[in-house]
Regions:
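Structural motif
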Residues: 107, 180, 260-262
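Extended, non-globular alpha-helical segments
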Residues: 19, 23-27, 32-39, 221-245, ...
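Conserved catalytic-core segment of nucleotide-activated headgroup transferases in glycan assembly
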Residues: 55-66, 73, 188-219
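Secretory-pathway glycan-assembly enzymes, especially type II membrane glycosyltransferases
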Residues: 69-155
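Donor-binding and catalytic core of enzymes assembling or modifying cell-surface/extracellular glycoconjugates
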Residues: 201-289
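Charged active-site motifs of nucleotide-sugar-dependent glycosyltransferases
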Residues: 44-46, 176-182, 215-216
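N-terminal pre-catalytic "stem/leader" segment of glycosyltransferase-like enzymes
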Residues: 1-96
């Protein structure tokens, strides 16, 4: 996300003010553009998130449990994610929506940041603010519970944890006799809160941790990250920057000999959460205490860990 995108996101967030009159709870807004359809008559639901300026990789994971719940409850569900995350939903058995599904849907579900884009469709739309400090539960469960209340269906027994991907190997081959740690020192969203000292601390921590635990370091990042980064990392054993897809990251995290992750609070962290593996996180921070508390309590991780998993076993801030 560049500064222009950041400005656009800020402007779109101001639309929350315009949405206040449509509020149905502390962070959701329903705009009824087709009054002949009542809440409990919705059948076809489209989760609409194709704009990569406002929908990052990890954001999709927050909404997958909702899609699963709606599908299990009997709704006809389609999803329009960003192109590079279509694989995730296809792998988990969802139908990918097309442009004609926008008109065909009884209800659109999207983020408040997409207000200006979605309001033009003149459809029944449920806007969700997933960054609201009013959220007081794990984000995935909060989304499911509140949407269920809106649709007049019961979600009390539903456990909202994002799905992994299945039966995917990809092109990455790791030595099964070596134990690894992934290292990702790049950031998109929230880059303006990160300074040189933060990057140095992340690198120094990884170098030290890998050495004392006899771990080989896998450097993760995009091709663009690698081209822009002129630093030399003498502790990296396997440089996979520019060589991994999002699906590859799921595969790497699933391997028994990949033990830990060191990164900012970003997409790869959320993948490791799914496999109950520990991430050492350099927190990007937030501007208010309420926002910081929300992220640490209900977003990292965005789901309630299984009873046998302690929070400190999957996330530690460095």
């Amino acid at each position: 996300m560049n500064y222009f995108s950041l400005i656009k996101k800020t402007v779109n967030l101001l639309n929350v003010v315009n949405l206040k009159k449509y509020s149905i709870n502390s962070n959701m807004y329903f705009v009824n553009r087709e009054s002949c359809i009542k809440n409990n008559k919705f059948k076809k639901i489209l989760l609409y998130f194709p704009n990569q300026e406002f929908m990052h990789f990890g954001d999709h994971l927050f909404f997958e449990p909702l899609a699963k719940f709606l599908k299990e409850t009997g709704f006809i569900v389609k999803i329009m994610p960003i192109k590079t995350m279509e694989f995730y939903f296809i792998n988990n058995g969802y139908d990918i929506g097309k442009d004609n599904d926008i008109l065909d849907a009884d209800l659109l579900i999207t983020r408040v940041e997409m207000y200006n884009e979605v309001i033009k469709f003149k459809k029944n739309t449920l806007f969700i603010d997933i960054a609201s400090s009013n959220i007081k539960h794990y984000l995935c469960q909060d989304i499911v519970n509140k949407v269920a209340d809106f649709l007049l269906v019961d979600a009390k027994s539903f456990y909202a944890k994002p799905s992994k991907i299945n039966n995917y190997h990809g092109k990455i081959e790791l030595n099964p006799d070596i134990e690894y740690i992934t290292f990702n020192n790049y950031i998109d969203s929230g880059f303006y809160r990160v300074r040189k000292k933060h990057y140095k601390h992340l690198s120094d921590y990884c170098k030290h941790f890998a050495k004392i635990n006899n771990l080989s370091v896998i450097h993760i990042g995009t091709k663009k990250d690698k081209e822009k980064d002129k630093n030399y990392y003498d502790f990296v054993d396997l440089d996979l920057r520019g060589e991994t897809s999002a699906a590859d990251l799921f595969y790497i995290a699933s391997l028994d000999n990949v033990k830990y992750n060191i990164s900012f609070d970003a997409f790869i962290m959320h993948i490791f959460f799914l496999y109950n593996k520990k991430s050492f996180i350099l927190f990007r921070g937030r501007y208010t205490k309420e926002a910081r508390n929300f992220v640490k309590q209900y977003l990292n991780p965005p789901f309630k860990p299984e009873p046998e998993i302690k929070i400190e076993n999957i996330v530690e801030y460095i």
